[in-house]
């Protein structure tokens, strides 16, 4: 009697409309079911039958119901699909094309076809770029994608690079130069400094050399420094085709094994590069560093010609200063340049230690990759004294540029860092107080107070406290007007020393030149700083993704079973520990199941960065632990580790 009853139908509709809804992100599992994460602390169960219409990462609205005394959700409306433009691997079955998205947790085949503009022919195992066109939660009967581009084939040894670049929609080739791009456009009078003994210090294999230095000592102990920077804007006119290309790339993209330059290589590695014994146009800055380490107020920017007398390597210069190895400078004059630069470096380090913020020495890892993409080894590179010589010289040059721009026109591309926002400043002060470190919010939100905090933390040298405070800090950014850089400890900072590889430095070059030539300066638009930040983010993600891929290949070929690795804990997540292997820099994940067998007794406290078992703290961020590798998953580029420990009672 209730069949086709309009009143009952209306009642069901009313009940359905009044049922609570929740919004969140779908998280799938390997066992078919999933969860709808509405915030970091709350999630709802999605049964396997309800997972068929959604994908991991989809942002949805779901109907909240109760089934067998358990709250579950039923996906109802798609807000934003996880997949839009994506990369994946082609599978061919019965002459039909499918694509498997290259993302963890996405394993299902998606039906696909090349779109009308794609001329590629796809084979099994090819890698491709695709666009999701149909989604089941939108009412479509299947997930469907259009192939827009073939990335490469299955046997290409450079798959990690090409797929990653395609994933982040980054260029994979250098821009092409036309004949006119290689002709010097500026006819300005330049100072002839070709007789001075300028030197460059860089990695042995560096070809795009931006900076050269010349120093001399004064009788009163002050040091005169001329920083000469390659001048690509003398060849590339504002608004030209090549300038537009550079403004889109923003940076040279440095990936493990090779780079994709912002400018054509015959400009960046030859015509503009400050190669030894080659006459080159430069934008130069004459700075005096006083014997107490301060920078003199008298700063001069000018155009010049120089001829670098020698290309030196970081290791050779460091060895000679540290009196190890057999290398000696090629001439007495160059030896003298190194000695004065070393003195300048020590003066500035002493000054920055007292008045600004010093960086902690960190270990860097570099992949040694063959021309054919084979990973030969992972090398540890430490910052040595020659690195610090160049670093201190560039910092002096960038402070000088910021001051010069601010004084003359009041704008440019500035690197800024705001320290703490108000909420995080309060959290930081509360955290510090628990370690008997007494600071006020007012104090640490000033540049002077922030620098003092960083100096205190450097003296304490507690990596856990340091990591927690960094978590409260703001991110670095760019600004078109002067602003402080708290993390460096300077009232203003503007880079101009890498115009071959950074478009922001090219912008500052043009502004500095407009001041020198007494021409009208055009303020950069606000949109450019957003483009710079976004491109930097994408480049960094690409570097991380390629590295993760190469580490899985590298370690899979090693006999890692039962080998113990020292590791540093870098993060605590909801379900495990992230750590970095000290030996080679690989990031590993330690799931809770490999830490303690009873999940209910485990507490991963992300807020404090600690792991508790039965209320007792066992691990925290910055701890050094020993691990073994239990699984290396090439498909998801993840390395699973487990701690070396005695079983918990």
From Swiss-Prot:
Keyword terms of this UniProt record? Cytoplasm, Exonuclease, Hydrolase, Nuclease, RNA-binding
A single GO BP term for this record reads: mRNA catabolic process
Q: Name one Pfam family in it.
A: RNB
Which InterPro entries does the record cross-reference, listed alphabetically? Answer: CSD, NA-bd_OB-fold, RNase_B_OB_dom, RNase_II, RNase_II/R, RNase_II/R_CS, RNase_II/RNase_R, RNR_Ribonuclease
> Domain of life here?
Bacteria
Look up the EC number in the record and give it: 3.1.13.1
Residues in RNB domain copies: 190-517
Transport in keyword set = no
Can you give the residue ranges of the S1 motif domain?
562-644
Q: What's its job?
A: Involved in mRNA degradation. Hydrolyzes single-stranded polyribonucleotides processively in the 3' to 5' direction.
- PANTHER family reported in the protein's UniProt record: EXORIBONUCLEASE 2, RIBONUCLEASE
User: Could you identify this protein by its name?
Assistant: Exoribonuclease 2
Q: Which organism is it from?
A: Buchnera aphidicola subsp. Acyrthosiphon pisum (strain Tuc7)
The organism's lineage? Bacteria, Pseudomonadati, Pseudomonadota, Gammaproteobacteria, Enterobacterales
Q: Which gene encodes it?
A: rnb
């Amino acid at each position: 009697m209730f069949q086709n009853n309009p009143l009952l139908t209306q009642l069901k509709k009313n009940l359905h409309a009044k049922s609570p809804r929740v919004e969140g992100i779908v998280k799938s599992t390997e066992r078919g079911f999933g969860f709808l994460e509405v915030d970091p602390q709350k999630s709802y169960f999605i049964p396997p039958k309800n997972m068929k219409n959604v994908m991991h990462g989809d942002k949805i609205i779901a109907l909240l119901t109760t089934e067998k005394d358990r709250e579950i959700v039923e996906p109802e409306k798609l807000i934003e699909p996880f997949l839009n433009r994506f990369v994946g691997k082609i599978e061919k079955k019965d002459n039909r094309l499918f694509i498997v998205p290259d993302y963890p947790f996405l394993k299902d085949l998606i039906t696909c076809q090349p779109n009308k503009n794609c001329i590629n022919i796809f084979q099994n195992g090819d890698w491709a770029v695709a666009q999701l066109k149909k989604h089941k939660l939108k009412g479509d009967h299947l997930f469907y994608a259009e192939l827009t581009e073939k990335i490469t084939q299955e046997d290409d040894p450079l798959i990690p690079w090409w797929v990653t670049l395609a994933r982040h929609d980054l260029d994979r080739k250098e821009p092409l130069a036309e004949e006119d791009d290689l002709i010097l456009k500026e006819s300005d009078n330049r100072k002839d400094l070709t007789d001075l003994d300028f030197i460059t210090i860089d990695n042995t294999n560096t070809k795009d050399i931006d900076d050269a230095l010349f120093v001399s000592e004064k009788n009163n102990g002050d040091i005169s420094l001329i920083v000469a920077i390659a001048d690509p804007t003398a060849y590339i006119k504002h608004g030209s085709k090549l300038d537009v290309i550079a403004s889109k790339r923003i940076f040279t993209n440095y990936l493990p094994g090779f780079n994709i330059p912002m400018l054509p290589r015959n400009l960046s590695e030859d015509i503009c590069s400050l190669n030894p014994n080659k006459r080159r146009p430069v934008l130069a800055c004459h700075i005096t560093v006083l014997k107490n380490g301060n920078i003199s107020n008298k700063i001069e920017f000018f155009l010049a010609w120089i001829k670098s007398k020698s290309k030196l390597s970081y290791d050779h210069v460091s060895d000679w200063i540290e009196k190890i190895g057999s290398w000696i400078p090629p001439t007495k004059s160059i030896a003298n340049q190194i000695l004065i630069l070393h003195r300048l470096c020590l003066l500035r380090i002493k000054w920055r230690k007292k008045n600004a913020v010093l960086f902690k020495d960190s270990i860097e890892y570099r992949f040694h990759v063959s021309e054919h993409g084979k990973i030969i080894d992972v090398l540890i590179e430490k910052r040595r004294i020659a690195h610090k010589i160049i670093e201190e010289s560039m910092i002096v040059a960038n402070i000088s540029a910021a001051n010069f721009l601010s004084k003359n026109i009041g704008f440019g591309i500035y690197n800024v860092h705001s320290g703490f926002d108000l909420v995080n400043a309060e959290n930081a002060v509360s955290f510090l107080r628990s370690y008997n470190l007494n600071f006020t919010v007012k104090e640490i939100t000033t540049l002077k107070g922030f620098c003092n905090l960083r100096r205190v933390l450097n003296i304490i040298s507690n990596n856990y406290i340091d990591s927690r405070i960094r978590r409260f800090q703001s991110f670095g950014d760019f600004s078109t007007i002067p602003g402080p850089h708290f993390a460096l400890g300077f009232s203003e900072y503007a880079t101009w020393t890498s115009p071959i590889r950074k478009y922001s430095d090219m912008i500052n070059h043009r502004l500095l030149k407009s001041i020198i030539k007494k021409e009208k300066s055009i303020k950069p638009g606000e949109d450019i700083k957003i483009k710079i930040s976004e491109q930097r983010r994408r480049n960094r993600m690409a570097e991380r993704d390629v590295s993760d891929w190469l580490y899985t290949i590298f370690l899979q070929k090693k006999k890692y079973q039962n080998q113990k690795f020292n590791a540093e804990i870098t993060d605590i997540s909801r379900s495990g520990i992230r750590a970095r292997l000290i030996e080679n820099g690989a990031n590993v994940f330690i799931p809770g199941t490999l830490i303690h067998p009873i999940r209910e007794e485990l507490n991963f406290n992300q807020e404090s960065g600690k792991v508790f078992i039965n209320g007792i703290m066992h691990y925290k961020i910055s701890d050094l632990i020993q691990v073994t590798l239990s699984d290396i998953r090439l498909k998801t580029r993840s390395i699973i580790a487990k701690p070396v420990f005695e079983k918990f009672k």
